[in-house]
Design a protein with these regions (language model features):
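Conserved beta-loop-beta element that borders a ligand/cofactor-binding pocket
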Residues: 4-5, 43-68
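Mid/C-terminal beta-alpha module of Rossmann-like enzyme folds, strongest
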Residues: 119-162
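Active-site helix of classical SDR
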Residues: 34, 38-41
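Conserved Rossmann-fold NAD(P)-dependent oxidoreductase catalytic core, especially the SDR/UDP-sugar
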Residues: 1-32
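Conserved loop-to-helix N-cap of the C-terminal "lid" that shapes the substrate pocket in Rossmann-like
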Residues: 59, 74-79, 97, 102-110, ...
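Conserved C-terminal active-site "lid" loop/helix of NAD(P)H-dependent oxidoreductases
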Residues: 106, 125, 138-139, 161-185, ...
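Glycine/proline-rich active-site loop of Rossmann-fold NAD(P)-dependent oxidoreductases
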Residues: 40, 66-80, 89, 94, ...
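Amphipathic terminal alpha-helices
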Residues: 189-204
Length: 204
């Protein structure tokens, strides 16, 4: 099993959810592109080993995974929002947050990986996304702040922070292929965020 990323899709020119065959543009001259390009290369290496040596390989492409298992060093926006909410702080956003994302609770992601591993077709890739949790970054932050009764604030980002941003305006994934294998998400976004904040707070 190879765990890839939704970032391999790049920027596509059409609207709608990303299917497993929707590959868009990635700027090769952006240092930020080292991540999605390396993931694409690793996927190709997997299927090359399948062809050359008959390796049984399945690829999964998780969306934005969140949950109480995040570390203090996790710098992703969703992790920062959950951390700030668990400390009952106002949540600070460094952008308008209008980018659309596929969120999925870490426990749902774990079951999705097992389903793909045990039932998936060799050489195929499967998106991991809860179709009930496709929202903007701002909407995710709003749920976090409202759950703990704090404010959502906005600040201008530094140039260094901007350089690390995922440039995909939409990375909403279609999980139909995975669902056809019998998987479905069990955590809706509100309850998943609430559970995550409560668990993180227990460790503080």
């Amino acid at each position: 099993l190879y765990i890839s990323s939704s970032e391999i899709y790049g920027k596509k020119t059409t609207d709608g959810l990303y299917n497993e065959s929707d590959y868009g543009y990635i700027d090769l001259l952006s240092s930020r592109s080292c991540y999605p390009i390396s993931k694409r290369a690793a996927e190709t290496m997997c299927v090359s080993f399948l062809k050359e040596y008959g390796c049984d390989v399945v690829i999964v492409r998780p969306g934005h995974i969140y949950g109480p298992t995040q570390t203090k060093e996790d710098s992703r926006a969703s992790a920062q929002f959950l951390r700030e909410a668990s400390e009952r702080k106002d949540i600070v956003m460094k952008s308008a947050g209008m980018q659309l994302r596929s969120y999925c609770h870490c426990l749902d992601c774990a079951t999705a990986i097992f389903v793909a591993l045990l039932r998936g077709e060799t050489g195929k890739a499967y998106n991991i996304s809860n179709h009930d949790s496709i929202v903007t970054i701002r909407q995710f932050a709003e749920i976090c702040s409202s759950y703990v009764g704090r404010q959502l604030l906005f600040e201008l980002p530094s140039s260094e922070e901007i350089s690390t941003y995922n440039k995909m305006e939409c990375s909403a994934l279609n999980s139909k292929l995975l669902e056809e294998l019998g998987w479905s998400g069990t955590w809706d976004l509100y309850n998943g965020i609430a559970e995550s904040i409560d668990r993180i707070r227990e460790r503080i």
